[in-house]
């Protein structure tokens, strides 16, 4: 029979196997009306660098689902691709240019920058895709997409123009989130709010022509330079007399009115709020309602502009310091309180964002959000776990219009052209040569690009060739499941849903499988700053892709963060070793090319393993249907390690080493059948090792990845016999425990007595004598119906079907053992005395470190338990 290498070394076969799969075209499904499609689109990794452990988890989960469905006979399509990642990539490229040439963005033309950006994209896209291949990802590489390639660009242009024509995209002056570092607008979803310990400054605003003043509380005194009113609640008795009066804006001298607006919370601060419509979204709404002027006091780099008077040119924080000082000097600062509040930060560079009045492009969200909410509420799209549905619905129920323009160069340029002569804006699917109104050729395109997530939102259908009516769209759309992290539910998941409903009139996927973050062994998020990140390729290089995949998925529950450690990696590598060695044993004992399973004359152990395997098939399939991939992996681990390797292989040895050719033929067929089909169950999780072993087994078909997924078989259900085998195995475990407790050498045989009450149990142990003698080191197995026949000097253990007893003289030299135990007791007593002496010493307990004191307490507990055990053993031996 064929053999595999003596030791498991994934480097010897992983690349070879992946090339074999690629050559055979197994990853590229054909459109087959006879087959059901199963489709996943990859969350496209950003072309900003390399894959991290989160990508490895995300893609392992997807590959498990795709490989499983492929084996079930589906036309399984996994579409790969990458994302241009506007802000992140532009920052990286500009950093590289600055390092190499000393030039900043201001020194470059758009074309010069884009040339370098495309070079970057090509380099890192190739690297990312090769890393996905290293992981074993069975994507259809013939359909690889990029969010800025020609087909995707056509889709983006079509969506923008279509939404513009429907009045769902507009350009307007609104408060947006501005990142002074990235120098671009951000959508609300791109702002991360962090708790910040700041202050509340209480400032006096004098009433014009009176001695009175109004006190307002603010966390941002620098924005008072842009105040145009002070608002109070119309029902607030404290200020009703001031409504309509004029205040003098401190430091600036501008006259501003006191207005009444129900937005004001009378219980916050003083109940009077400064209104700065150009620098606060809520103030903006008040400004619109009351027809107030908009005074912008900040430049795009977060310095004060010409509207800030003497503070012009100062950074926002410098201005704050100076303004507070000036207010204090003029007696207008009443008090300062510490105050904890949430401050928005740029999700890319962590700079504090600035709410800024700016002319930008927006998507009108209310008409798009309603149907997106409806499909989830109706259960047409299900979140796994269900709890993440709340994040989705909460975001859509409170959604604001989406700011989609970015002041960047890398991205989809907004397809809007401005006429220099008549001022008309032409929005067009094709690049226009003249103004559509006046015919002037004096037109120029909008300088801004679209938010990265705009093109990503079209991913489920743009990857299949939309807006063309392609065969792929007809057959593979909608997709089946989206696998992604919980951190981009609103960034990406929600947007794909509303865009798909708008343009495909259908949901983009049926399930959203959410996974958590991969954290380090201490539970910390992996990051460059902490230096605790582990490169997936490093793990693959040391241990192989299968070990990494299995480490990431075993025990992993949907939606939960997982801890990654080298210790877990070692466990998975040991599992692969165990499987490899067990497979070698099977291969060395098989007959050439016999793929039959012989069900006549099955031994008890054969029936047990076939029943257990059969149940595992049902359980694993059920787990995968429910997206319980971590549970499935754990069950496979236990089945392979404990039941197949530790039990069945050991139970098979007496048969294979016997002269009974018929029994050998049957057991060999069971070994091959269970191994073959267990490899199939394991294949989605550990594709390389399973393929390598399977190719060496007698098999039919080209590859395990297109072999049929195992099905539950009624003819392999031997539940009653399996229960009998479990009883025999329980007895073997009990005998092994007795031998271990008595320190008996593995080579020493001992008589075993099994006392039973029921005749059925007597028959079971009679039939299992051979197994007990071989696996428990028994010289003889005596089955008794009367417990009185058990010698007094025997070690015993109760099991479900009776009592196991091993006479002590069979195990040990009684006198020698008594002597050894008495010596051990003396040592233990000395340790107890030492620990008690320390713990009774008040000085030690008070002055020694808590850690040291606790260690002594634990030692005392341990030695006390040891003493009890020794004395029980001595009592038994002396009785």
UniProtKB/Swiss-Prot annotation:
Q: Which Gene3D superfamilies match?
A: HUPs (3.40.50.620), Isoleucyl-tRNA Synthetase, Domain 1 (1.10.730.10), Valyl-tRNA synthetase, C-terminal domain (1.10.287.380)
The record's family statement is: Belongs to the class-I aminoacyl-tRNA synthetase family. ValS type 1 subfamily.
- What chemistry does it catalyse, as a reaction equation? tRNA(Val) + L-valine + ATP = L-valyl-tRNA(Val) + AMP + diphosphate
Q: What is the lineage of its organism?
A: Bacteria, Bacillati, Bacillota, Clostridia, Thermoanaerobacterales
Residue spans making up a coiled coil are: 804-879
Q: Where in the cell is it found?
A: Cytoplasm
Q: Per the Swiss-Prot or TrEMBL record, what residue ranges does the short sequence motif 'HIGH' region cover?
A: 45-55
Q: Provide a Gene Ontology MF annotation, just one.
A: ATP binding
> What is the protein's name according to its record?
Valine--tRNA ligase
**Where is the motif named 'KMSKS' region mapped on this chain?**
525-529
List the keywords (alphabetical): Aminoacyl-tRNA synthetase, ATP-binding, Coiled coil, Cytoplasm, Ligase, Nucleotide-binding, Protein biosynthesis
